[in-house]
């Protein structure tokens, strides 16, 4: 299918009224990360994913591309309840000019705190052949990450309407 159909990450902000721990209701605008082909699919997917968790009215207030080269998640680790964005600088040698070339990439890390995020990043990068330095690691406001999954279709759903 080529790059035209390459899945990518979208940060979707969802605005709704949330009941806080003290019992007060507050309007919040929370970001979620969704794996999708385009903006239209990202909106439809975030609505599908969060609807079961919403009790009142909500709206998708913003969608933007999120460029993450890699994601290091911590499935099954309940203490890893935050997402951190790390900017990595890769140093390569330009063979023609002989000069060092620096390129940067963002990665997303699920971790409990900053120290844990750096540890998980280093573990995740162990297999990398490229030299890198960590330029920054910052906590994000991302609430959750939704990967693309192929849903099982019911019998007959894949038939065109005129054949049904």
Residue spans of the language-model regions?
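Short amphipathic beta-strand and strand-loop transition segments with alternating hydrophobic
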Residues: 63-76, 137-147
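Short, solvent-exposed interaction modules
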Residues: 66-129
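Short, well-structured hydrophobic secondary-structure segments
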Residues: 35-70
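Short, small-residue-biased leader/transition segments that mark boundaries at the very start
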Residues: 1-5
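The feature marks the first
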Residues: 6-44, 90
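Glycine-rich, aromatic-bearing surface loops/beta-hairpins
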Residues: 128-164
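A cross-kingdom feature marking solvent-exposed beta-strand/loop segments within repeated
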Residues: 18-35, 52-55, 99-107, 127-129, ...
